[in-house]
Amino acid sequence: MTERRLTRIHSIKERLGDSLSHHPNELLALFSRFIKQGKGMLERHQLLTEYESVIPEADREKLKDGVFEDTLRASQEAIVIPPWVALAIRPRPGVWEYVRVNVNELAVEECSEYLKFKEDLVDRSSQSNFVLEMDFEPFNANVPRPSLSKSIGNGVQFLNRHLSSKLFHDKESLYPLLNFLREHNYKGTTLMLNDRLQSLSALQTALRKADRYLLSISKDTPYSEFNHSFQVLGLEKGWGDTASRVSENIHLLLDLLEAPDPSTLEKFLGTIPMVFNVVILSPHGYFAQANVLGYPDTGGQVVYILDQVRALETEMLLKIKQQGLDITPRILIVTRLLPDAVGTTCGQRLERVLGTEHTHILRVPFRTDKGILRKWISRFEVWPYLETYAEDVAHELAGEMQATPDLIIGNYSDGNLVASLLAHRLGITQCTIAHALEKTKYPNSDIYLKKFDDQYHFSCQFTADLIAMNQSDFIITSTFQEIAGSKDTVGQYESHTAFTLPGLYRVVHGIDVFDPKFNIVSPGADMSIYYPYFEQEKRLTALHAEIEELLYSSVENEEHKFVLKDRNKPIIFSMARLDRVKNMTGLVELYGKNDRLKELVNLVVVAGDHGKESKDLEEQAELKKMYKLIEEYKLQGHIRWISAQMNRVRNGELYRYIADTKGAFVQPAFYEAFGLTVVESMTCGLPTFATCHGGPAEIIVHGVSGFHIDPYHGDKASEQLVSFFEKCKEDPAHWEKISQGGLQRIYEKYTWKLYSERLMTLAGVYGFWKYVSNLDRRETRRYLEMFYALKYRNLAKSVPLAIDN
């Protein structure tokens, strides 16, 4: 029998060195090509293009036997500073290695100071000066974390497995659970257990007595009828509204005390009423329920939050009722009050959210020592106002809620920073939702900070993001890609693992995507508004005349420009803000370039506002570009350009009307964190093509529930559209197949009911673990206080204050 041996796994440096030894001519030619381009940065796609260009196919076949091609494909970027080429290699999501090659000597070495080397691209002085380095890794050394990429985004399951084995290794270690249940209360009223129960044995005895008592009464008996008997045993309200539900929960706890396991623990914690008052932060933009969508900085995030709170309130009311409590929950969406409200309700302090009973929008103004800021300002200019804003919000919450919130949820960079300040001040559980991290949307905006900072103030924003993501108790994302990208692309959070802001600081370890604080909780679309086109009894036919006017009238005005000459064609439809990243002009260009596509279908885009001059510089530039493209490709007769539509109900029917034409929805963004419009269109049964960069790549199963397109390759995307519509022309069942595939995908994964159930469970589980373990990360918080006071504050002061006209 052959003896089995353990062999050492060679490092990437060693394997790359072997490749250079075995194929010196081919690799010298390639690296020399990199060097010839001079000092600079090469992106992954450029590296692969050069590889295929320089090395003949026959030689590439030889290289496939080794590791070089795999290493090159795993390289996300190369820094070229002759004679060195440094590679940032990502073998799998969340795992990075850095090497550099001396092309003159064909020698490879590890590049432990990769960021310092990278800074040479823009700032040679960093080599001699002391540079602040931020490193959060030592503070998280004792936080358990998985090692497999597939575990990323399943933080709560991993945490429960790890900590329950630690916490429940013997009877004595269960005391933190007993103490947690005894101390749990609402506004001073004890819930779950009272002080009669001082030991675990007393708790088990009381639970068994309660169980025997419940067997003697009807399952439907209301809790109020045996409330007094349970109080004598040491059990308070919160176990359930009926004998049946109380019995289920008592059995869960008995099972947990007898044989602890993670799933029982999570299930039990999910039944404990812990969240009654929720605060949701979203300061920037025009936050209102009507007439705001399409305004600058006002889009999917507003829709997300309004749908979120309706589902959340429904879930909270249901849980409170099921637990037998008479408590009124409260949800407050905190946003900015805009005295210059331009025809919206953004100047109103308090506004109830339609479709809810206990949820309101609370608006608090931005102010300085000179008074209240009246006008809208860009999300990139809010930084100098946020500290004072957080203080004002704390004061308003105390008066409005009359209780300390149980959970605070931040949205986007500004909301997450304010949530961090409030959570730190009030000592409450904090949840972070990024929606979009700008560092990913604007490639190389870190290393080339000086190019961006005057306009976008990314030095403030990236610092705020770093503070919020490290302080938060848990982070929810809509997709895996938001956290850790894919095999070939870097995730939004992952891009904050290590980066540099030349002249400010280096982040050598910013966030770990394996951290158990990350959880994927995908939202859905409001199914009272977005539902399939074939549900004829629900269709809003009264709106069809308006929609036909919008799409087909021969009149051009401030709401719609350009006239479609053939209304019998299917429609390619798209709806988004008019900014560079959303890439609506890219869609118009790929359509304009493809004559066959123009023959097959019309194009309808909803973006921007013809009726007013935008204050947003990016929107102004995209507006001009759109007109130029329409003229260049002679799209009059083929395109309808509609101003941003504020009416969500009509938008839902608009999706369905497009489906009636057997059209398709296209989402062409260069990057999309999630893709709410993708979910909306699929929920309406409209076949959907969406960017492969970001969340839509997970929402859509390519070829089954829709199609992925690459906005960086418009010609290929247009051919995909041609192929689809030609196939549908030959076989109408193909359109139905993709439509049904999209609906099936939505029902399985993307509904608000699933979302709200999961969010409530997460809030309870993280609140519990924060109580019984060291998950409050006190050391990290002290480090963040210093970072905020010494770095963020000065950066925020450097942002010019807005001036009211």
Curated annotation (Swiss-Prot):
Single biological process term from Gene Ontology: sucrose metabolic process
Alphabetical UniProt keywords: Glycosyltransferase, Transferase
Protein origin, superkingdom: Eukaryota
Catalytic activity: an NDP-alpha-D-glucose + D-fructose = a ribonucleoside 5'-diphosphate + sucrose + H(+)
Function summary: Sucrose-cleaving enzyme that provides UDP-glucose and fructose for various metabolic pathways.
InterPro entries recorded: Glyco_trans_1, Sucrose_synth_GT-B1, Sucrose_synthase_pln/cyn, SUS_EPBD, SUS_N
Annotated EC: 2.4.1.13
Origin species: Tulipa gesneriana
Family assignment from sequence similarity: Belongs to the glycosyltransferase 1 family. Plant sucrose synthase subfamily.
EC class name: transferase
Keyword Transferase (UniProt): yes
Protein name in UniProt: Sucrose synthase 1
GO molecular function: sucrose synthase activity
GT-B glycosyltransferase, as annotated region: 274-751
